[in-house]
Amino acid sequence: MTLPPLSHLDRLEAESIHILREVAAEFRAPVMLYSVGKDSSVLLHLLLKAFAPSRPPIPLLHIDTRWKFREMIAFRDRRAAETGVDLRVHINPDGVAQDVSPISHGAAVHTDIMKTQGLKQALEQGGFDAAIGGARRDEEKSRAKERVFSFRNARHRWDPKNQRPELWNLYNARTKPGESVRVFPLSNWTELDVWLYIYREKIPVVPLYFAAPRPVVARDGAWIMVDDARLPLHPGETPQLRSVRFRTLGCYPLTGAIESSADTLEAVIAEMLVSTSSERQGRMIDHAPGASMEQKKVEGYF
């Protein structure tokens, strides 16, 4: 009997599930990083599929910067309750003590303390030896050269020149004392693949990905949403309601929206088919002087 060929989404799904099961089998204490974005939503769906009907043996870890969109936090808690996964939330206590924010300390310092240092704290406190993330190679040039199994030294630093070859679907999971691994099951997916899979599998995502009238101000060539009263308005600034959506989600003062009328999955996919810009165009941290993604990853970033 000849089986019908797998679609490209079926092949990507099978590869990702294989990687998730490989992580569960090879590592002592793996964890999945859950940022609440679309890629994390796909990863959670794949995790549930990989170990169904059992509860996934891998907990979720959310690094909370205290500046995420309110809709993201509500969605995070709702999905954890719906799926029954083991969700752990970490906030860098040092950052809280210093009251670090993107407003008072700037994007680079805020990202380093609340994201990078917060992540390293959580991994060390939890004793995790593998952290699964939703990064994809099509997102950014430094991620394009990262392996599926990306090894980090005892200080969680990434050396792009000291990575192991990966032959076909064979992964070397052996680590040296103190070494850990970041694992990226969505490495070979594109942004369009992610949206097509969300559509096919009916995966819930944060409503911020869909266009709606939202209060925004224009800053540095981007529309910044006024999500709460903590965002100080510049002289002469007045929030205006515009139909916008987000292609990527992070801390709200550092995440630019795009003007759009795409308020359904079908409309988002149609918009994606003609888009000529990167999904990370709205990440203000990427445009800061000296804030290359590779340098942040070398220092321990996702």
Curated annotation (Swiss-Prot):
InterPro entries: PAPS_reduct_dom (IPR002500), Rossmann-like_a/b/a_fold (IPR014729), SO4_adenylTrfase_ssu (IPR011784), Sulfate_adenylyltrnsfr_sub2 (IPR050128). The lineage of its organism: Bacteria, Pseudomonadati, Pseudomonadota, Gammaproteobacteria, Lysobacterales. Heterodimer composed of CysD, the smaller subunit, and CysN. This is Sulfate adenylyltransferase subunit 2. Its EC number is 2.7.7.4. It catalyses: sulfate + ATP + H(+) = adenosine 5'-phosphosulfate + diphosphate. Belongs to the PAPS reductase family. CysD subfamily. GO terms for molecular function: ATP binding; sulfate adenylyltransferase (ATP) activity. Keywords: ATP-binding, Nucleotide-binding, Nucleotidyltransferase, Transferase. Disulfide bonds: none annotated. NCBIfam families: CysD (TIGR02039), PRK05253.1 (NF003587), PRK12563.1 (NF009214). SUPFAM superfamilies: Adenine nucleotide alpha hydrolases-like. With CysN forms the ATP sulfurylase (ATPS) that catalyzes the adenylation of sulfate producing adenosine 5'-phosphosulfate (APS) and diphosphate, the first enzymatic step in sulfur assimilation pathway. APS synthesis involves the formation of a high-energy phosphoric-sulfuric acid anhydride bond driven by GTP hydrolysis by CysN coupled to ATP hydrolysis by CysD. Pathway: Sulfur metabolism; hydrogen sulfide biosynthesis; sulfite from sulfate: step 1/3. HAMAP family: Sulf_adenylyltr_sub2. GO terms for biological process: hydrogen sulfide biosynthetic process; sulfate assimilation.
